Amino acid sequence: PIQAATLPNSLAGRDVLGRGRTGSGKTLAFGLALLARTAGQRAEPRQPLGLILVPTRELAQQVTDALTPYARSVKLRLATVVGGMSIGRQASALRGGAEVVVATPGRLKDLIDRGECRLDQVSITVLDEADQMADMGFMPQVTALLDQVRPEGQRMLFSATLDRNVDLLVRRYLTDPVVHSVDPSAGAVTTM
């Protein structure tokens, strides 16, 4: 809503490929669009509507902290699903109904395997730091998860680099994406 003027593509539901480093303001760029497009909907238990995949627990926490005030203001429930924390508590958050899930791939896959989460209602998927997920060996889980979300849904992928693995993701899962390059040092965004 606040940054709607800067987010025409993501708000319009276009697939987005963002090239940018951490801390270039992209969390709000994808997060506000996801929240704005999900606002007014209610998730059934275990069936989130929006998914943000990140490589690390630390990044999951940063994204959650950044988006929580905005999510509250539009009455959306966020669940954070990461390794190294109580899986029981995360399962109960999903059972209670969370519109948006911020997750690391391994733990999300564990919860799906346990029957605690389904992705077939997810219509907006964000991959943040996709190159880091590839470097950490998460590609098999990431593709398995992307294969479960709604095929006609919106996808936004952010990556500092576009190596072979990330390029494969872009080609396989993004449809006619609009490409943004973010240079945090200049604070400039170029659209191609």
Residues covered by each model-derived region:
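Interdomain coupling/hinge region of P-loop NTPase helicase/AAA+ cores
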Residues: 51, 70, 79, 90, ...
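Short alpha-helical elements of helix-turn-helix
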Residues: 4, 29-34, 136-139
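Short glycine-rich anion-binding loops that position phosphate/pyrophosphate groups of nucleotides
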Residues: 23, 106-108, 131-132
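Residues at the beta-strand->loop junction immediately N-terminal to the Walker
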Residues: 17-21, 53-54, 159
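Conserved nucleic-acid-binding Ia/Ib motif block in the N-terminal RecA-like helicase ATPase lobe
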Residues: 43-113, 121-124, 167-171, 179-182
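Walker A/P-loop
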Residues: 14-34
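Nucleotide phosphate-binding site architecture
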Residues: 17, 35, 39, 60, ...
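Conserved pre-motif I regulatory segment
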Residues: 1-19
